[in-house]
Design a protein with these regions (language model features):
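Glycine-rich, charged/polar anion/phosphate-binding loops
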Residues: 1-2, 26-29, 123, 139
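Internal helical hairpin/lid segments
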Residues: 52-142
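Catalytic phosphate/nucleotide-handling subdomain of diverse soluble enzymes
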Residues: 186-192
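Short intrinsically disordered, low-complexity coil segments enriched in acidic
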Residues: 1-4, 188
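Short conserved micro-motifs at the rims of enzyme active sites and ligand-binding pockets
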Residues: 54, 164-166, 189
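Cysteine-cluster motifs in flexible loop/terminal segments that predominantly coordinate metals
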Residues: 129-185
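A conserved active-site cap/scaffold subdomain adjacent to cofactor or substrate pockets
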Residues: 9-77
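Solvent-exposed alpha-helices and their adjacent loops that cap or buttress functional pockets
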Residues: 3-13, 31-35, 130, 145-146, ...
């Protein structure tokens, strides 16, 4: 909601993460689709899953439709995995969290309940995770919000690579910057 409701939002559709929806279901995504009038497709992570989800999303956009579709029905149901949800509810509670490129959002993350303090590394080892700011030239916050492409970044592919990442989207192999880096094509049409 922080991204979809932001001024200047350009997100036209979402591919929802199948691994999350396998546990949590997709009810919340149905609500987002209706609230913001955008198509959302739940997808698995195999290449054919992603291609099929992209096609489903494109068809909805072309037809002016906005609803949730479940491409990953072999694993995801509307209600997810009730046993896993009960276990998560037993161990975790919602908490305010800071999100890269967005800031602190109330009740947007999870923390272990006090009854699990004995297993909670933050409590047991009295750790304090200090926030690390990205370098000023890193535009990962804009990439994460869908306001810029990885290739718009002056550090992309030079000072910022998967082996020397400057921001979160280059760290993870699932990140937009890392994906662009690994699958980019040169201007002449060949691999770079």
């Amino acid at each position: 909601r922080a991204i979809l409701g932001a001024e200047g939002n350009r997100v036209q559709g979402l591919i929802a993460p199948g691994h999350v929806c396998t546990v949590m279901g997709y009810r919340e995504y149905e609500e987002l689709s209706a609230e913001y009038g955008i198509p959302i497709v739940v997808a698995g992570f195999e290449p054919l899953d992603l291609l099929a989800a992209t096609l489903m999303l494109a068809r909805q956009l072309e037809q002016g439709r906005a609803r949730l579709e479940n491409q990953y029905s072999r694993s995801v149901t509307r209600d997810g995995n009730p046993a896993a949800r009960r276990l998560m509810d037993e161990v975790f509670e919602t908490a305010d969290r800071k999100w890269r490129g967005i800031g602190r959002l109330p009740l947007s993350g999870l923390r272990m309940r006090a009854s699990y303090d004995e297993q909670n590394a933050e409590v047991r080892f009295e750790t304090a995770v200090e926030p690390v700011d990205e370098p000023a030239e890193c535009i990962s916050a804009m990439v994460l919000r869908g306001r810029a492409k990885p290739t718009d970044c002056p550090a992309f592919g030079g000072r910022c690579t998967p082996s020397n990442p400057m921001g979160a989207p280059m760290v993870s192999t699932e990140g937009a910057c890392a994906a662009y880096y690994h699958f980019r094509r040169s201007e002449s049409g060949g691999e770079s």
